[in-house]
Structure formats: structure tokens, C-alpha cells
């Protein structure tokens, strides 16, 4: 996807509104962002104590499930070229998110969970940089700049399967799955016996084959069955052979913190 932003911008001064960085987004022709599927061409100005940095080839669209229906909208940014948008310590990538945190009146839960994840040594936790967001001249408030959840170095760093497997190929992974109550609209999803909706984020629908989907279903079902069995705590008969216990415990804890 190539974003072309040759439209004329009105001259204005881009200033840092508070001690936080300020992000100015100006869409082509001032078009509103009303879709979670269609990107709107835009220019972005990132202002902090180091000055103004301008990105002139990107698109912006909505994101989220239930959060997209709230008054303060979350957004996804996609640059034409990969950017170290949150610095060299994080991913170099095209896609980034602006979280509104509208349902959290402290605005802190997602960021605190990310900090705890870093402290606990989780393999990956999303970035958390608070910013002020101004869209087409209107101040929208405090947002959290963060990573897009995807398979990539310094994000979900697993072996990506980007080709259709050949007959007899090893299909044990890696796989990027999400437990998603709103995932019924996702192209690859299924439910466990306990009605847990699971979506497959990677591999993409274009390359994943039925044999891989069955492998995922079977592995996850074995885990669920063991977790809810009377032997769940047994190191051999319980859930532990199917999952890394420490990262699972961390995930459960972070989900509690993030509510």
C-alpha cells in the first residue's frame, strides 16, 4: 500500500502543547476518519523537545472493536516506509497505534501493564508513550502511542510463516493467536469446547492451510482440557506441557491489572 500525500497544507506553527510530545495529523482535504478498514491519506508532525519531525506519506484509519464505538476514537497509523517511530529500542515498522483509553478514566492501565511486563521480563510488551493528539486542527486529548500487534522483530518475535506449506512440511509454528470475544468477523477463527473464541493473526489467511488450523485447534484443545481437568496441577498430566507457565502466569496477572 502506497500513500500519496501531495495535497496542500495550510501553514501553521507546530508547537508542543504540554510536556508530552504532540502529534498533529492532517488528512487530505480535512477528510474525517470514519472507517476501520479504509485508510485516509495524511501528513503527521511529531513535536517534542527536540523539535518537529514531519512524515508526509502515511494513512490513518480507525481501530479497535467496542472501543471504536466510544466518543473518543482510537486510530491506526500506517507509514509508506518502515519507521523507528518510538525510537531504536522498539520495532522499525510501518504500523503503529494511537490508543484513546477512553474507558479508563486514569488513562494509565495499559501503560502500567506494559511497564510491569517489561519489569517481569515478558518477551514482548507493547510500547507506551503518552502524547497529545491534534487531528485536523482539533485537540482530541491524551493518547497512548503504541505498537501494532504483529509478527515482527521487537514485537511478536516468532518464526513467521509467510508461504503456503508444502506437503510434509513442519507445521508446529510459530503461530500468533488471540483470545478475542469480537473475533467472529476475523477471517480465521474458531471456538474451543468451552466457547472461547480464538483468532489466528499469523499466518495470514492467504497462506494458512486447513492442516495448520487443525493443528492449532487440537493443540489448544489439549491445553484447555488439561487446564480444566482434575489433574490440572500435575506437571505431566496437567496444562504445563502445553504452555510456558511463567509467561502464562504473567499474562493472567496483567489482564487483572489492565481491567
Which role does the model predict for each range below?
Residues 1-12:
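Bacterial Sec-dependent N-terminal signal peptides
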Residues 11-259:
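Phosphate/dinucleotide-binding and metal-coordinating scaffold of catalytic cores
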